[in-house]
Amino acid sequence: MMGMELSTSGTRKIAARRRQIAMSPYFGKPDFSGLGEVDAGRPKLDQVSLADLLRNGFVYPPHSILDNVKLATFGFNPKGDMYSAPEFRFSFRDSGKRKDADTGQDWIGTYHRLLCDAYSKSCAEMKSPWLLQSGGKDSTPLAIAAAEIRPDTTCITYLGGNEENEVGSACYVAQKLGLRHEILVCDPGRAYDRYLAIVERMPLLTADFALLSYVDLATTISESGGDGVVDGMGSDNYFGTPVDRQHRWLSALARGLRLPRFLSELPVIGRNFELCYLLSTLQMHPIERVFPGSRFTDAEVDELFGRDIAEQSKARLALFQSEFASATGPDELCAMALTVAGATGGFAKGLFTASALSLRAAYPFCDPDLREWVYRQVPLDQLIDPVTRTSKVLMRKHIATRFGELPYITRKGSFRFDLCGLARDRFEQVHAYALRTRKVLPGAARWLERNRDRLDNKYHASKFSLLAVVLPWIDTHSRPL
């Protein structure tokens, strides 16, 4: 187990041994084994990184939850010094994409071949791969490849709640392809117990909104004899991310205001998700509104810590501002922002969980041959439709060679976990963690007590889930050696 002390500055009497890890599926498998070596140097909790987690659900790279462990994620040079000279460059600029229209080449056939190769390579060391299968536009091409290359793949689908039911589409895809298919219905208490069972082995910390569902799935896979998880993340960066009118409007509303706390606690507002979401948006930085999920406001984060710290977290955006400022439009800016968030958010949840459960994690869409071909060779109109603004045109055409229009591709909800159920079932447990970690977050218990009656609103329940993830990790990893 890794011991830890608190750190509020870069100055300390005994310097802990510094570690730097290349952590991105685009770079290959990350090596977390070196984290055990930092025990001798008394690694310390980076409190600004903790503020990152509470404000955004992830730690701004190249930082990690530990102040002497830096992460070279995609966009950074893994051979560079992440302590003294980190420099972020987005690798899939629009300027590098092919501008001419479709020339009649067999784009679908080439895409299928490269995807099958990517699937085969990424799962080569797995004896029993399990594919996270939603029946949507990312996981369905992987299922098509699996049926051809690794028919021993098992598909598994998570039923997280009423808002986002992927089961029908996923079952149809798996059955038509002849793949075994399993369904895991969300039980928030079970998922949380599974997280607590592995939290001591989680090498670092993220608070991605899908972490608990991922842990639930990965534990089921492990208990069922699977030795690897196949994840459909990674294609958004190079296919592109079209920004719709709603998200442009929300970014425009993000003004970085400091609003009084009582507004979100008024009876009319406090129980209304949409109004709470709108109020929180007004208090965000425009870039940070792009990041998914509902999080603590800056004022709430300062209250949780009992001192001003949110501005130090927000200041970490400065590292990315020059690259953001050079974006040619909202789509490219969104892709840049999501690359930053996904590195230590979406990707991290899988990498950390797989490490804790001794599973292999595969990300076929991050394969260098596949991604470079799509980015540099496929025409723009096959990435994003210039008229309809439909995303991943080539991927959809690939799916259409086997299936008609899949329901989950056209209708997508917002939450994949029963957040309100978690708050209802595990409030006392999380409150106890808040009391045990009050030296780190002295305001956490008070926030829980004040908002207990509002946790049937998924806006407040989302914040509860952040504390539910963060507090046990702090409690476990901050014990003396």
Predicted stretch roles:
Residues 1-193, 198, 203:
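Cysteine-centered catalytic environments shared across enzyme families
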Residues 7, 11-20, 37, 229, ...:
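Mid-to-C-terminal catalytic subdomains of enzymes
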Residues 107-131, 220-224, 341-349, 471-479:
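Phosphate/ATP-binding catalytic cores across multiple sugar-kinase/actin-like superfamilies
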Residues 119, 213-214, 260, 281-406, ...:
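Conserved glycine-rich, hydrophobic/aromatic-active-site segments
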Residues 159-221, 235-256, 376-384:
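ATP-dependent adenylate-handling ligase core
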Residues 207-208, 230-241, 279-288:
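Extended catalytic-interface subdomain
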Residues 248-282:
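Short, flexible loop segments at boundaries between secondary-structure elements
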Residues 436-481:
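Acidic, carboxylate-rich catalytic segments that either coordinate divalent cations
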